[in-house]
Amino acid sequence: MSKRLSIKEIDALLRQGDASIDETFLAMLKADERKGVQSALKRYERQLEKEKALWMEHEEMLAYEKDLWAKGYEHVAGLDEVGRGPLAGPVVTAAVILPKDVQLPGLTDSKKLAKETRESFYDRIKEVALAWSVAIVPVTVIDEVNIYQATKQGMMSAIDQLSVNPDALLLDAMNLPLSLPQQSLIKGDQKSLSIAASSVLAKVTRDRYMADLANRYPEYGFERHVGYGTEEHLAALNAHGITPEHRRSFRPVQETAATRQTS
């Protein structure tokens, strides 16, 4: 790069992470007196720091997997659920087995990710995973056995559906009646990459389910609150009553049903 580049050209190179960027080039930019060059350089350095932090977090979130891999457990499945708290809709569970060379920087608890980022990870996880599965447990089962047992059933089903048999499990605050070695981690979707991956698959699947439900019952606003007991949802329950997708074993739904029967 012998000729003096314009600020626009420099900014484009830095934004693209061009292969020609080396220590010599960066030293040249630091010595450049133009304010626009210094602004572009600072932006580039901030981006590098951000990427470095993401990779550090990525390594930290593989600590549990690496420990199990080192002990000879080749196929470690992470499991998580989405939808235990809502008044309507299913609880969705997912299981994911990641390869040892997995690269998913930025992946964390699905609730902390923007929708577009979550959707992107959803596709990427399915591409790179050794195996993945999703189980949807309907309202009828939730009402029959309770939400905790329904969640367990969903996780067992997700494990059964995996195309690769896991030999160890990482779970988000759950224990399953299985002989497989398993670790239950509080806030596991923030501590384990495998659990975080399963939380993304579960959440995207459930959000899409609730969006479809919103088309069937547009007056309830399911596309916004996804079944949780928000003010909007409770008002819709009082105004329109209970749908087949509402959990009759949950108190706010029971109270709505009782109120409408006596009115």
UniProtKB/Swiss-Prot annotation:
Primary location class: cytoplasm
Listed EC numbers: 3.1.26.4
Residue numbers binding a divalent metal cation: D80, E81, D172
Protein's GO biological process: DNA replication, removal of RNA primer; mismatch repair
Enzymatic class: hydrolase
Subcellular location: Cytoplasm
Cofactors: Mn(2+); Mg(2+)
InterPro entries, A to Z: RNase_HII, RNase_HII/HIII, RNase_HII/HIII_dom, RNaseH-like_sf, RNaseH_sf
Chain's role: Endonuclease that specifically degrades the RNA of RNA-DNA hybrids.
NCBIfam families named among the record's database cross-references: PRK00015.1-1 (NF000594), PRK00015.1-3 (NF000595)
Identification of the protein by name: Ribonuclease HII
Lineage: Bacteria, Bacillati, Bacillota, Bacilli, Bacillales
